[in-house]
């Protein structure tokens, strides 16, 4: 869920039909678009290796590779401290512009953010001589109430655009940790995105059941719950976003 520059999911394109070919459940959007909903195709059980494809690897080992692939990040056993790719590796100009989290049982919107348009950002930077931080958009910090930890199913809806190149095999692997403990792995396929398209998507997150002791510790230790979101095109890492979480809101 690391998206302030958002994170998420699956959908139709405003540039024409088939902007994303991946949806399993479809629902008409206002305005005639199509919102596709995806559940994770693979969700590794908590506290265990995800795919049995090999021994655990370290962040340093992955940083030494020329190409990082999905099977590599699935073998990480802790959250990363650094980004595993550079912003310029996103040669497809994938840009997340809006992000919303909602409780699927009640429909309550829990979090929503939109990215300012580029022209506004450029004008503000020119007027105020603001230095550009290349990490902006790669990290987001969330604060939720304790009740969030008792939710079972959450929908994360995102809008994103792609540049003038087709995007094939677009996939996100998101791994959530509390301290050194892997809580859950989510693995979503976006599918194919046509060039110069704007897409709207929703990922369905089915959260693990946590013990009361773990819930208490997560509430008492804000921002020690962290996640990595890895984005792949044709099985090559092109984007890496991070997030951390507090669950003591309203206290």
From Swiss-Prot:
GO biological process, one term: lipoprotein transport
Chain segments annotated as transmembrane: none
Region (Disordered): 1-56
GO molecular function: lipid binding
Superkingdom as given in the UniProt entry: Eukaryota
InterPro entries per record: Ig_E-set, PDE6D_unc-119_myristoyl-bd, PDED_dom, PDED_dom_sf
Keywords for the protein's UniProt record, in alphabetical order: Acetylation, Cell projection, Cilium, Cilium biogenesis/degradation, Lipid-binding, Protein transport, Transport
Chain positions recorded as tetradecanoate binding sites: 142
N-acetylserine: residues bearing it: 2
Assembly with partners or alone: Found in a complex with ARL3, RP2 and UNC119B; RP2 induces hydrolysis of GTP ARL3 in the complex, leading to the release of UNC119B. Interacts with NPHP3 (when myristoylated). Interacts with CYS1 (when myristoylated). Interacts with MACIR; interaction only takes place when UNC119B is not liganded with myristoylated proteins.
Family that this chain belongs to: Belongs to the PDE6D/unc-119 family.
Annotated function: Myristoyl-binding protein that acts as a cargo adapter: specifically binds the myristoyl moiety of a subset of N-terminally myristoylated proteins and is required for their localization. Binds myristoylated NPHP3 and plays a key role in localization of NPHP3 to the primary cilium membrane. Does not bind all myristoylated proteins. Probably plays a role in trafficking proteins in photoreceptor cells.
Protein name, entry field: Protein unc-119 homolog B
Organism annotation: Mus musculus (Mouse)
């Amino acid at each position: 869920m690391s998206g302030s520059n958002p994170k998420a999911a699956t959908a139709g394109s405003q540039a024409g039909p088939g902007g994303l070919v991946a949806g399993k459940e479809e629902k008409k959007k206002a305005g005639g678009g199509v919102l596709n909903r995806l559940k994770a195709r693979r969700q590794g059980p908590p506290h265990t290796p995800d795919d049995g494809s090999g021994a655990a690897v370290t962040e340093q080992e992955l940083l030494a590779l020329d190409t990082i692939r999905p099977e590599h990040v699935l073998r990480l056993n802790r959250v990363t401290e650094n980004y595993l790719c550079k912003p310029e590796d996103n040669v497809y100009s994938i840009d997340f512009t809006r992000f919303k989290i909602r409780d699927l049982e009640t429909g309550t919107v829990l979090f929503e953010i939109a990215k300012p348009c580029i022209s506004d950002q450029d004008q503000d930077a020119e007027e105020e001589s603001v230095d550009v931080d290349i990490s902006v958009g790669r990290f987001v910090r969330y604060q939720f109430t304790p009740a969030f930890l008792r939710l079972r199913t959450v929908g994360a809806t995102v809008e994103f655009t792609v540049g003038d190149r087709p995007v094939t095999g677009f996939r996100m692997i998101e791994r959530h940790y509390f301290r050194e403990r892997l809580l859950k792995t989510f693995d979503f396929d976006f599918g194919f995105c046509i060039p110069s398209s704007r897409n709207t998507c929703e990922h369905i997150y089915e959260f693990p059941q946590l013990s009361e002791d773990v819930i208490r510790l997560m509430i008492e230790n804000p921002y020690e719950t962290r996640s990595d979101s890895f984005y792949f095109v044709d099985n090559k890492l092109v984007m890496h976003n991070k997030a951390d979480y507090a669950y003591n809101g309203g206290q």
